[in-house]
Structures are given as C-alpha cells and as structure tokens.
C-alpha cells in the first residue's frame, strides 16, 4: 500500500544522479507513503523529508552516496515537538502516529553519515541497513534542534565494509524515550552511544573485526582469520598461534572501540551483547541499568586487556549478566564500589571471576 511509486518519477534528461527524482517523489507525497523499488540509486546531493512522507523501501533498494555531504537522508517532522500537541495549519490536531522509514540500504560510502531522524513523536524505523557512515550510521536528534521521542527502532543493521572510518558511531542519540530492539552494529568504532536518557535498548548486539588491521586487505585478513579459526575448531590453538595473531595486528575498527557508551541517565540495556571491543560498557550519568547482558572478547581478533565495564557514573545497576575471559587478560570492572549495585552476575571461570572482584573492589558478586 502506497501513495506514490518512485518509478513514476524518472530522471530528467539533464540529471546525472537519482537525488533530484527521489526528492521530487518525496515532495509529492506529504503525509503519505512513497514506495522505492529494488535498485541502486546514486545520491550526489542530500535528501530531505520535511513533509512527513513515509518511505517503504525494497530490502535491495540501495541509496549510495557518490559525493561528500552531511547525511544521505534526513527526516525532520518540521514542527515544534517540544510542545505537548502539534497542530496542522488549519488548527486541527496533527496526530498521525504511523509515520515510518522501512527497509532499504543506505550506503554512505565513507562520504557522509547515513540517516538523521529529528522532530517526531512515535516514529518507526525498521528493517534498514546503514553502511559506511563517515560519522554516524543512525543519528537521532543530533544538531537538528526540536525534539524526537518515542522512536521505535527495530532490526536496524549498521555495518562498515570499507577502511578509513575509524572513530565513527553506529547508532547515536541525544534524544529521550527511544526504544531500540534487535539492532546490530558491526565495525563502527562506537556501537551505540546515548547522550540523553530514558532510552531502552533491548537485544542489541555490537561486534567488530571483519575489517582488517591497517595495511592488510580484507581478503588477506579473512583468510588469516579462517586459518586460525580452524585451529580453534580442531583444538590445536597453541601459544604459537596466539603469538602469530598478536603480531598480525588489531583490526582497524576495534582499536579504542566501545560497544555501548551511556553518557546520560536512566538508560536500560536488557539482553544486550558487547561482543569484542576494547571497552564493552562505558557508563556515565546516573541510574543506568545493565541486565541480562554479556561481554565476550574473540581472541582471534587480537584484542587483549579488554574491559567489560568502565563505570564513571554516579549510580549503576548490573544484574543477571555473564562475562567471559577467553584470552586470560580481559578485565571485568573498573570503577568505584560505592556507585554500583551488583547482583546475580557470573563468569565462565567462576572462581577467577569471584577472586577478581574480591581483590580489585572488595566486592563479591
């Protein structure tokens, strides 16, 4: 079901990319649904949604940046969502709670950030892939001003497949009251960063290492990793194999990486997984909760001395979590005892896990 279809908006004779025709289609669909079919679309200038148009994109509809820009696509609800009620021009209440972007694959190609969402109430983002964001995969709020709350983000898949983007962020928000469920971030230096509070992150999985160490090709790295993986499967992982991995170097996007960074208050991580990062959970602010979650460091990636939780917050609750130490060098916690509530957590080496906390923090899990 849609109101307009992109096939009805072909390129004009003088146009050399797809940005103008997609923008025309968006502008012709106020408060409606635009269908974008399968295909590769060259984006040489940024796309803007300012008329509450929703996008229904085929999973193989790819918006590929070909020039430098800030964002490939920006959504701005174009109203003062700081106020309790938004009105139409005729004075009636605007209350369309079904606005969305669904599907598609935005490849910023290292030239831009992928997607900005701003100024909306109960907006849905689902089943979308965000690749190779220069600064962000998904940015919620950012510098756009206004207010976005009750974002429902489901099956958002962020991944970098090209080198040279170290320091970027997969999912960033400085807005409140967002619900992020079943989101995956692969090979962004910071997976998820929340600079505002009251957000809920459920079953979000952050990992990295598919991009190679600097100076190596993706093919070389993939083959090297595969050979070492066979050693693990065959139970032939030796000190010699480990030394070879350490000499090869750490994958580019894992250097100084953080899976989850919480810089504000009352955010909740439930069922989340920090899977191979320099720091799993970096927590500031106060009254944040990490529950039913875990930390793991894939030793084949070459990271050592990783840290599961770095607590710089005024108050942190950690419950029912599982932490692993596959390299024998991974650390579980850094921070003050007085600022953490610790309950029902465990590790794969229970005795080492208990001894660590007793020695480092005089605190028993």
Identify what each model region corresponds to.
Residues 1-6, 349-365:
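Glycine-rich, low-complexity segments
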Residues 6-37:
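Acidic Gly/Asp/Thr-rich repetitive segments characteristic of extracellular carbohydrate-active
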Residues 19, 31-69, 106, 110:
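N-terminal extracellular ligand-recognition/capping segment immediately after the signal peptide
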Residues 26-30, 48-50, 93-95, 118-119, ...:
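Flexible, charged surface loops at secondary-structure boundaries
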Residues 36, 54-58, 81, 94-102, ...:
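All-beta strand scaffolds that present successive hydrophobic residues in beta-strands
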Residues 44-46, 59, 64-70, 109-115, ...:
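Short glycine/acidic-rich loop motifs that flank beta-strands on beta-rich extracellular proteins
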Residues 68-93:
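Aromatic/His-enriched, Gly/Pro-containing loop or helix-boundary segments
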Residues 92-187:
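Right-handed parallel beta-helix
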């Amino acid at each position: 079901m849609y109101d307009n279809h992109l096939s009805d908006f072909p390129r004009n004779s003088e146009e050399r990319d797809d940005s103008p025709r997609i923008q025309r289609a968006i502008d012709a669909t106020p408060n409606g649904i635009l269908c974008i079919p399968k295909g590769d679309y060259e984006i040489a200038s940024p796309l803007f949604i300012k008329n509450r148009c929703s996008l229904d994109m085929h999973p193989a509809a790819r918006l590929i940046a070909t020039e430098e820009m800030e964002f490939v696509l920006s959504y701005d609800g174009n109203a003062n969502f700081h106020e309790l009620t938004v009105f139409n021009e005729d004075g009636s209440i605007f209350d369309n709670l079904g606005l969305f972007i669904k599907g598609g694959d935005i490849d910023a190609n290292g030239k831009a950030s992928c997607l900005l969402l701003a100024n909306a109430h109960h907006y849905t983002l689902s089943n979308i892939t965000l690749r190779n964001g220069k600064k962000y995969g998904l940015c919620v709020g950012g510098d756009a001003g206004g207010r976005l709350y009750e974002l429902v983000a489901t099956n958002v898949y962020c991944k970098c497949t090209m080198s040279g983007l170290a320091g970027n962020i997969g999912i960033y928000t400085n807005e409140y009251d967002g619900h992020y469920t079943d989101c995956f971030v692969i090979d962004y230096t910071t997976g998820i960063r929340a600079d505002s509070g009251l957000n809920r992150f459920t079953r979000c999985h952050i990992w990295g290492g598919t991009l190679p160490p600097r100076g190596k090709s993706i093919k070389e790295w993939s083959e090297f990793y595969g050979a070492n993986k066979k050693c693990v499967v065959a139970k032939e992982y030796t000190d010699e194999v480990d030394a070879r991995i350490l000499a090869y170097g750490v994958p580019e996007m894992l250097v100084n990486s953080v899976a989850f960074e919480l810089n504000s208050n009352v955010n909740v991580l439930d069922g989340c997984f920090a899977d191979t990062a320099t720091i799993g959970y970096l927590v500031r602010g106060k009254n944040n909760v990490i529950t039913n979650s875990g930390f793991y460091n894939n030793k084949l990636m070459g990271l050592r001395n990783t840290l599961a939780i770095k607590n710089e917050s005024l108050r942190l609750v950690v419950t029912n979590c599982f932490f692993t130490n596959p390299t024998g060098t991974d650390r579980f916690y850094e921070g003050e005892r007085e600022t953490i509530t610790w309950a029902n957590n465990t590790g794969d080496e229970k005795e080492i896990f208990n001894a660590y906390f007793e020695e480092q923090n005089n605190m028993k899990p």
